[in-house]
Design a protein with these regions (language model features):
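Positively charged n-region of N-terminal signal peptides that target proteins for export
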Residues: 1-4
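Bacterial N-terminal signal peptides
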Residues: 7-16
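N-terminal leader/targeting segments and the immediate start of mature chains
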Residues: 19-61, 230-249
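Short beta-strand segments that buttress and anchor functional surface loops
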Residues: 49-51, 78-82, 142-149
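Short, surface-exposed coil-to-beta transition loops
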Residues: 63-66, 81-82, 89-90, 152-157, ...
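An acidic-aromatic
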Residues: 69-117
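Extended beta-strand-rich segments in extracellular/periplasmic secretory proteins, especially
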Residues: 119-179, 244, 248
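Non-transmembrane domains of secretory- and envelope-associated proteins
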Residues: 164-249
Length: 249
């Protein structure tokens, strides 16, 4: 099940990048730019994210959930999702896999959460037949994307607080093929609980500021750099292996 949540995490806000009809492009860009600016300008912002999965025909019957915590200060981000911790600072993106006792180290990789419109212009010609709609009610703005057949996502709905620009909820209607093992799928009324179409909801809550310092993003708590291509885990992570994913390290 984690594979689905990680797929959604990777795709979060990136799915806002496909081509739009010409008359909707500006409105969608403005919507996403509001989100981008809100998170880019936030100082020491933290919040909670709850992921819930349900089958298409029972959207209120959640069969799996995961929760995460995000802390960010402009382009510095820490994301904790169960046993995986990811930190991005000016020098590294650090991914700590606690169950595997592995520290995965690479050059800084900016998340789509901090730059949700970065890929829009370069992807404008990728898809055709995608429709968009923006609605506003009660201080909330909702962007709905309906994708053409043949893609992993059917629909994506994003709701933001119009005053702050912060995400409140993101809903993905998606196909689960390739994300769920065969023995987990419902087949003729038997087998696992997962169907061929599902829904993932991400609910953002508990927004707060000033609860941490820049030390939260420091690589020094995970490792010591001994020289080019040489890193040693700190005492806390002494039984972890460090994997270097970039020759530039």
């Amino acid at each position: 099940m984690k594979k689905i949540f990680l797929q959604v995490l990777i795709g979060c806000l990136l799915v806002s990048a496909p081509a739009f009809a010409a008359d909707s492009t500006n409105a969608v860009k403005q919507f996403m730019q509001q989100v981008q600016q809100a998170y880019r300008s936030a100082n020491f912002l933290s919040f909670h994210v709850l992921y819930s999965y349900a089958n298409k025909n029972q959207p209120d019957n959640y069969i799996d959930t995961m929760s995460g915590e995000v802390a960010m200060n402009r382009n510095h981000v820490r994301f904790l999702l169960e046993d995986v911790e990811t930190v991005t600072n000016d020098h590294y993106t650090i991914q700590v896999h606690k169950d595997e006792k592995l520290i995965y180290l690479t050059t800084p990789q900016q998340t789509q959460l901090t730059d949700p419109v970065a890929a829009i212009d370069s992807a404008l010609s990728h898809f055709e037949g995608l429709s968009t709609r923006i609605t506003r009610t009660g201080g909330l703005a909702t962007l709905t994307l309906a994708f053409p057949p043949g893609l992993a996502y059917k629909n994506v709905t994003m709701t933001i607080n119009e005053h702050t620009g912060y995400l409140q909820k993101v809903v993905y209607d998606m196909y689960t093929k390739g994300l769920v093992e065969k023995d987990q799928m419902v087949d003729g009324g038997s087998g696992g609980p997962y169907q061929s179409e599902g829904r993932v909801e991400m609910v953002f809550s508990q927004y707060r500021q000033g609860q941490f310092t820049d030390g939260l993003f420091s690589g020094e708590q995970y490792f010591t750099r001994l020289g080019q291509g040489k890193y040693q885990p700190t005492e806390k992570y002494k039984d972890y292996q460090i994997f270097l994913a970039s020759p530039k390290l």
